[in-house]
C-alpha cells in the first residue's frame, strides 16, 4: 500500500496509549516508518511494552521510549505525558488515545435469565463494570486530552486523535457499555475540536474498523477483517487530512452517514432488532 502522506509525520513527536499490542503498536510502528521524530509507547502491560520498546529501539535508536502507565489514573497520565515531553525535547505534536477495552454483557439480571449469558459466559453489567468501562474507554482519553492541551496550547498547537468505534452509532444488543463509552468519547472529541480550533490544536475521532486484535477473544472475527497495520495506515492517513471523523473500513464508511437518517429509520430498527434476536438465540455474540 503506497502512502503519499509520509512527509506529514516527518520529525513529529508522538505519544500513543495502549501501545503494547494491536492497533496501538501498529500505529507506533507506522509513525516511525513514516519518519516521526520520537515516539512514546504507553501501556499498562509492562512485559509486552518492554519487549516492543526494545525491538523498536534497535530499529530506531534514540527515537523510542516506553512508559508503563495506568491510564485510568489522572495523575499517572499527567506524569506519563510529562516524562514523554522531556524525552521528546519539549515538543509534543501528536497524542493518540488508543487504550480501550471491549465489553459485552447483559444489562439486567432479569434479562440474563433468558439471554445468551449462560452459553457465552456474559456477565450481568454491574455498576462496577460500568465504572470500569468508562474509566478505561472514556476517562483515560479525557485525562490525556487535558494533559496534552496543557502542553500544546503554549507551544502553538498540536493534534489529538481519540480512537472510538463504529459501535458509537451502531446500537448492538449486549454491548451497551462499550457503545455508551465510545459514543461519549466521540462527542467529547468533536466538541473539543471546535473549542480548541483557534489554539491550533486539531482533534480527530477515528474508528479502526473491524480489525484482527485480541479484543475478539474467543470469538471469530467477521470475514474480511483487516490487520492492525492496515487499520493504522488508514487512521494515520485521516490524521494527515485532519478529518473530523476518520472511518477505518467500508462498513464504517457506509454506516456512519445513515445512522441518524430519518428516511431509513424503519429499516434501521428492523436491522438492529434482528441482530438482537439473533444474539438472544445464542447464534452470535461479538
Regions found by a protein language model. Name each.
Residues 46-47, 68-80, 127:
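The beta1-alpha1 cofactor-binding region of Rossmann-like NAD(H)/NADP(H)-dependent oxidoreductases
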Residues 36-52:
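Conserved glycine-rich Rossmann-like NAD(P)H-binding loop of the short-chain dehydrogenase/reductase
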Residues 106-131:
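Substrate-binding pocket helix/loop in short-chain dehydrogenase/reductase
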Residues 145, 181:
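Active-site helix of classical SDR
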Residues 2-40:
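Canonical Rossmann dinucleotide-binding motif of NAD(H)/NADP(H)-dependent dehydrogenases/reductases
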Residues 165:
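Residue(s) in the substrate-gating loop at a strand-loop-helix junction
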Residues 187, 193-254:
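SDR active-site lid
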Amino acid at each position: 500500500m503506497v502512502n503519499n502522506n509520509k512527509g506529514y509525520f516527518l520529525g513529529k513527536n508522538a505519544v500513543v496509549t495502549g501501545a503494547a499490542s494491536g492497533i496501538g503498536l501498529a500505529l507506533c510502528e507506522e509513525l516511525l516508518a513514516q519518519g516521526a521524530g520520537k515516539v512514546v509507547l504507553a501501556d499498562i502491560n509492562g512485559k509486552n511494552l518492554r519487549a516492543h520498546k526494545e525491538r523498536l529501539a534497535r530499529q530506531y535508536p534514540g527515537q523510542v521510549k516506553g512508559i508503563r502507565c495506568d491510564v485510568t489514573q489522572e495523575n499517572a497520565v499527567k506524569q506519563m505525558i510529562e516524562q514523554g515531553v522531556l524525552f521528546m525535547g519539549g515538543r509534543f505534536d501528536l497524542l493518540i488515545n488508543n487504550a480501550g477495552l471491549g465489553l459485552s454483557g447483559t444489562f439486567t439480571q432479569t434479562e440474563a435469565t433468558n439471554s445468551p449469558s449462560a452459553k457465552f459466559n456474559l456477565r450481568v453489567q454491574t455498576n462496577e463494570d460500568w465504572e470500569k468501562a468508562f474509566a478505561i474507554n472514556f476517562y483515560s482519553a479525557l485525562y490525556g486530552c487535558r494533559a496534552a492541551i496543557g502542553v500544546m496550547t503554549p507551544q502553538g498547537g498540536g493534534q489529538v486523535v481519540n480512537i472510538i468505534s463504529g459501535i458509537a452509532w451502531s446500537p448492538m444488543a449486549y454491548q451497551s457499555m462499550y457503545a455508551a463509552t465510545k459514543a461519549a468519547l466521540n462527542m467529547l472529541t468533536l466538541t473539543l475540536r471546535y473549542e480548541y480550533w483557534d489554539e491550533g490544536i486539531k482533534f480527530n475521532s477515528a474508528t479502526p474498523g473491524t480489525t484482527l486484535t485480541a479484543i475478539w477473544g474467543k470469538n471469530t472475527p467477521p470475514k474480511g477483517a483487516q490487520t492492525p497495520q492496515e487499520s493504522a495506515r488508514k487512521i494515520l492517513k485521516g490524521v494527515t487530512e485532519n478529518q473530523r471523523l476518520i472511518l477505518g473500513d467500508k462498513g464504517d464508511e457506509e454506516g456512519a452517514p445513515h445512522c441518524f437518517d430519518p428516511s431509513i429509520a424503519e429499516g434501521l430498527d428492523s436491522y438492529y432488532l434482528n441482530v438482537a434476536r439473533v444474539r438472544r438465540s445464542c447464534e452470535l455474540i461479538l
